[in-house]
Amino acid sequence: MHINVGSVHEREQIEQLAELTGEAERYGLPVLAMTYARGPDIDPEADDYNQAVGHAVRLGEELGADVVKTGYTGDAESFQHVVESTSLPVVIAGGSKGTDEETLSMVRGAMDAGASGVSMGRSIFQHDEPEKIARAVASVVHDDAEAEAALREAGLAVEA
């Protein structure tokens, strides 16, 4: 279930997430809410974009989620605000397609900001070598590896 704070569908998405978390609680099921700041008045390039993302993850908590997934805001300093906006574990989405080093640098920045991990799909399963990139991501998340070292250890090329 996801909410796009700032979208034209925000109200319905909030209602749906609230309903889902209520039902999930009845059955003892955890909920991962995908919480994003997206919409006509949301500018990902704005200096205060991390405030909007922080609001989105906090809203996920207030609506009963157990874990929130969101997009990385571009650097560890701005993402730290996002992580500090909630008491829930925060995991990042894979984001737009980039180089392996860009992906792992994003993961490194999120972890440095206090994120709990990642929830990646296409960044892994559409990769030419999904096992290797998954190993590299795991190395950053679980072994505190730097991006370049994780690439080398996984047997992936490091861009020059």
Model-predicted regions and their roles:
Residues 1-90, 98-116, 120, 139, ...:
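Alpha/beta enzyme core
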Residues 103-104, 128-137:
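Histidine/acidic-residue-rich catalytic or RNA/ligand-binding cores of hydrolases
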Residues 122-128:
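A short, acidic, flexible beta-alpha connecting loop/helix-capping segment that sits on the rim
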